[in-house]
Amino acid sequence: MAKENGKVKAFFHDVRTYWKTPPEGKYVPYREYLSIFGAVGGDYTLQYLCGFLSFGTGCYLVAFYYQIPLLTFAAINTFFIATNYLWSILSMGVDANLGFLPKKVERKYFAIYLSFAVLGLLMLFFDFSAFLPDGVRLALDSKWAGIDAVGFFKIFGAYFLCNGWGGFRGIVIRKLLLKKLGRYKLFAYSNIVQGVTVAVLICWLPLYELPMTERVWKLFLLFQLYGMFAFTGHTQKVAFNISPNQQERLFVNSYPVKLSHIVQNIVNFLLPTIAGALFVGGISDRDTFRYLLPAFFVVSAIIMFISLGKIKERIPAPPIEKKEYYSFWTCIAGIFKNRYLWINSAVGLLDSLGNGMLNMKTILLIYTWRETGLLFSVAEIVLKFAGTPGQLLAPWIRKRFQYKTLMVFSQIVNAGRSVIYIVAFLFLGKLHWLCGILLFIAYFLGDGLTSALKIAQNDMNIRISDYQMYISGERFEGYQGIIGWFTGPITSLVGLIIPLMFVSAGFTSDWDVLYMDDVRIKCMIIGIAFDLAGYILMMLPYIFFWDYTDEKHVEIMKELQARADRLGEETNAPQQDAQIKEPAPTGETT
């Protein structure tokens, strides 16, 4: 006991001593921990609230009130498989260079972005379907539920407008605000007002009164604008990269970041409870979206921004004025050498077997227990708490187990949980409370046993960027999604399997059919079986190919530090006027 008291006293002594200035070897003073708590807590809460609004089956507003056909979402996603590559190329080039491009390159970017923005506006204001032959127009009118020839062009217009204008706007914002706000904070500041405004429009506009074909494209336009003004997740990125010190970074993400979930948990409790008390439909009632959601958006945004300005970004990087310009092919060559990105992409491809699966918490709470009020709130909080002990112990667990071991263990747990889900639906599916209790226990235990992995994954993503710098001279974070070019089309096609099988089981766009035991049981067993197959296959790449150990990372960091020291010794050499320019053919920084 005396020993434990001594540790507590030593901790509080350190807090007082290093309140404003961190100890040697560390970077984050304890005072900043409070700011991280508030900023990340507000950000997590906003992400929770944003989760209620999505152009997909998981959105109550879209599913219950707009009744968009299930296959409409999949059809729209397939429209843009090819064009997504163009936007990926452009955005990766901008992100990798932080928006600071040579003048000639910048003019080309602006020409492409603004051309598509103008084309999108024309498609939205004029009926392009009038130029189609009657046969083609008739085919478009009858091919997809909820989409006709007019709506087809409007959907493309919304897509082109938001991607074109969003790309142009992104370059301008970076050039104006990046030096002042940092690479992660700038979009949180510049998007919040527009993002919340569009969210309120989605909640308030009476689009459900429109014909289905008009309703679909107007909803799609609103959600494209909503995505263009994304304002969440940026604060988390600051916290994930808060310190070059590995253990300090893990500590920050295990304690102040994890404890900040308290803010979200309060909203998790209040929102469904108030909705259940005020509105007949509870959390899924339309008035919840009209009145409660906007109010919680505003309060959460205020909480985040009060603390956000007090957090510092500590990413080792040269001054913007001295930053090299890296061409597309230089970045591609560097990314293709990173074997760990390939392994993660292979795992993601295998994980797509479960794409289209219904949310287990929704099925458990609404369609099995049939709760939307107080019990819904309490159950959600308990399930979210399941991962807390593991995440608080993450630094201790990560010290003692390699990342490979944690990944394999996690997939074993997920596979076991899927087996329990199948047993619950197969044998207890019509006994609602017994089935729900078994689902609840399996969900809780699964999250509890795998929770430490979430923090370990965030840390590993940073280590993979360290490895990228080790092999190519730059982190190329904006290009790390390029391997998705190869896996993305396959993922989209695989994602059609479960929705098509749901249709054969009797579930299309009417979610009320999930209250029917036979339909719900059949749909859940189908989806979980695909999930189970994915979890088993996801173990294999880590077992046979992953060799990024902690010891290897230590050696990489030593080499990176040695390179930084050598470059530091060269800073006194005569320099020409700094300008953004093409790198040497090797792709190395100078």
How should these model regions be labeled?
Residues 572-590:
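Intrinsically disordered, low-complexity cytosolic terminal tails
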